[in-house]
Amino acid sequence: MVGASGSDAGAISGSGNQRLPTLTDLLYQLATRAVTSEELVRRSLRAIDVSQPTLNAFRVVLTESALADAAAADKRRAAGDTAPLLGIPIAVKDDVDVAGVPTAFGTQGYVAPATDDCEVVRRLKAAGAVIVGKTNTCELGQWPFTSGPGFGHTRNPWSRRHTPGGSSGGSAAAVAAGLVTAAIGSDGAGSIRIPAAWTHLVGIKPQRGRISTWPLPEAFNGVTVNGVLARTVEDAALVLDAASGNVEGDRHQPPPVTVSDFVGIAPGPLKIALSTHFPYTGFRAKLHPEILAATQRVGDQLELLGHTVVKGNPDYGLRLSWNFLARSTAGLWEWAERLGDEVTLDRRTVSNLRMGHVLSQAILRSARRHEAADQRRVGSIFDIVDVVLAPTTAQPPPMARAFDRLGSFGTDRAIIAACPSTWPWNLLGWPSINVPAGFTSDGLPIGVQLMGPANSEGMLISLAAELEAVSGWATKQPQVWWTS
């Protein structure tokens, strides 16, 4: 048991709660006819229904279409179809389009239903996945918490008092609680990696363009990408492969790769920089001592695996945060226009929209021109190392209501204090993976990120799989409180 007196946070390892199956477990059960897709989907829908009043992971549950798709998947399997995710229940974040369903993106008010599936949903369905629902996210994906007047507060499966993080907090909560074995999220400043860190999950932010953002040629001026949350590296890699690919209109189209091929293959001896220096943002951030210790323990594990670990920090410079701010807030302005006039926005969103409008012309163009120089400067660390290891967050997950009464300045200061280190890789467009790294003395999950150069998902996934094999993190799961 991981936990502390006075806290409802905790984990169990192997006994007590029923073991949660992995996605690969479910694929085996389907292949051997031990279970049908309809049975799996009904099980997932029941778990969602029971948990929704307390955990609140979902914005929309697609009961009717999910059951129809499950029945179709069973017929496909009986006919010999071997699609990679055939019959597997999957959740998607409520910032991607599912035909016939509004994409509210955390807002309150009327949003017209989407007319078509977006490309990532289309690819998941083509791979046989059954979309059971759309998960909660904070408003326009801006913050590392998942709450808002349109849906309430999403809770952390490891502690009902804490946030799962954000903005892909609903997806993280759904996977950590076992409602689904994997979910799609998006990451524009850490929005997959942060909730993955705070819910004991693998969270992959892939190379920009690895997963299409179509019908958007790019999202938030290229800083936001779609990615995957799962409990194991193998599960995350399988879903990433199924979701990856491009259409002609995508602005970013990296060379294709099958990342699941790298699971179980040793990456060879690597040189890894252990970095605890945060990029400049104008706000102060202090690394929690237990997160520092956890990061150092992962470094020790990597050395035992035969890698060389040295202290080292990327050269972030002073301008990087300004370039990021211009691209991200200008992207907010574009998304708000897409939603229309019938949504009610948080006052902090309105403030950020004003900034985005101001920055959306000459300053945005300047920020984009600086990308190559930013990549050269920060990427110079890869002249001497292969991977950067860093804390995913500076602090453990905050309370679920910690941000409710804060204004714009207070929110910005609080989120930088908690999460100062993930956003540069969004600006650069490069892959990064959060992996579980233990727990605080209060039983709250800790994560670290493996950060690589362009198109390095294979190496990072191979390295993450090595860490999973020696740490056994997938055997640990939260005590169930959300069914009562």
Curated annotation (Swiss-Prot):
Extract one GO molecular function annotation from the record.
Answer: amidase activity
Supply the PROSITE patterns for this chain: AMIDASES
Output the SUPFAM superfamilies linked to this UniProt entry.
Amidase signature (AS) enzymes (SSF75304)
Pfam families given in the database record: Amidase
Which residues are the active-site ones? 93 (charge relay system), 167 (charge relay system), 191 (acyl-ester intermediate)
Instruction: Spell out the reaction equation it catalyses.
Output: a monocarboxylic acid amide + H2O = a monocarboxylate + NH4(+)
Q: Which UniProt keywords apply?
A: Hydrolase
Broad enzyme group: hydrolase
State which Enzyme Commission number(s) the record gives.
3.5.1.4
Q: Which InterPro entries match?
A: Amidase, Amidase_CS, Amidase_dom, AS_sf
Q: Which Gene3D superfamilies match?
A: Amidase signature (AS) domain
Organism domain of life? Bacteria
What family does this chain come from, according to its entry?
Answer: Belongs to the amidase family.
Protein name per UniProt: Putative amidase AmiA2
Its source organism is Mycobacterium bovis (strain ATCC BAA-935 / AF2122/97)
